[in-house]
């Protein structure tokens, strides 16, 4: 097994692109291990409905990235207090779905620090009832990776805020995340532990006393990783557009009237829109409903679709920004 450095990159779109690139393009006769740390971001499972997993208003206000990964499972929050690890190897027939095989050295490293960690259920590492690590896998032909999070010292308030869904009724066939009590590993340590030291302890558990052999990515590798990031992980189509069909319902009682929004959304675009309420406006809201059909379901695109319409004409004295926020 060889170790791959990510050059301390914290851009989640690059780190996920690097992981996929290594899986699909590096020499298959080798196995690889890598770490990466992301700036504040939500990493959504491959089969999830992104809008159902995130508090979009909050993450927009706090510049939190949302990126879809190629493995299944639920949405997770990453920040610089969270260490991600990934084993990339062949599926020998006994590896895919075998979370114990890949989490065992991680659990051993934690136990060496006095943390009473164990693999529980299908894919979580816990201390008692508290989850400190979630794991997921993906397989491409005969190659696979098993990757996971290690919450050393994450901002737990942000974990709750960023993953709290907006107060909308969204019904879809996406895979919903299961929320558990989460905790930082630091809570179970007697002394502070820096992430760089944590990395060394894990590497020693995996490689033993032998020198850690490193596989260095070339300039060409990094160019290809950047291209994959641009073409896939930085696109709305990948991160949001893969959403299954869903029904969006939201309502709010403003000082000047009640407004209810109902959208049918498919692959991120509004297919059908209805607006109800007891507001006092002159215009026929059918104009707005028609303007919204085909629009991407997010604040920016709804704002653009309605840019030529005077919403006061339709809703009376209700704030334009608040109306568009309600729709998104």
From Swiss-Prot:
Q: What pathway is this protein said to act in by its record?
A: Protein modification; protein lipoylation via exogenous pathway; protein N(6)-(lipoyl)lysine from lipoate: step 1/2; Protein modification; protein lipoylation via exogenous pathway; protein N(6)-(lipoyl)lysine from lipoate: step 2/2
> What is the role of this chain?
Catalyzes the lipoylation of proteins, such as GcvH (SAV0833) and GcvH-L (SAV0324), likely via the ATP-dependent activation of lipoate to lipoyl-AMP and the transfer of the activated lipoyl onto the lipoyl domain of the target protein.
Q: What is its EC number?
A: 6.3.1.20
For this record, the Gene Ontology CC terms, alphabetical, are: cytoplasm
Offer one example of a GO biological process linked to this entry. protein lipoylation
Q: What is this protein called?
A: Lipoate--protein ligase 1
Domain (BPL/LPL catalytic) ranges: 27-214
Q: Which residues bind (R)-lipoate?
A: 131
Name which cysteines form disulfide bonds.
Answer: none
- In this chain, ATP is annotated as bound at 69, 74-77, 131
Which top-level group of life is the source organism from? Bacteria
Catalyses:
L-lysyl-[lipoyl-carrier protein] + (R)-lipoate + ATP = N(6)-[(R)-lipoyl]-L-lysyl-[lipoyl-carrier protein] + AMP + diphosphate + H(+)
Signal peptide interval:
none
What are this entry's molecular-function GO terms?
ATP binding; lipoate-protein ligase activity; lipoyltransferase activity
- Taxonomic lineage per UniProt? Bacteria, Bacillati, Bacillota, Bacilli, Bacillales
Q: Which UniProt keywords apply?
A: ATP-binding, Ligase, Nucleotide-binding
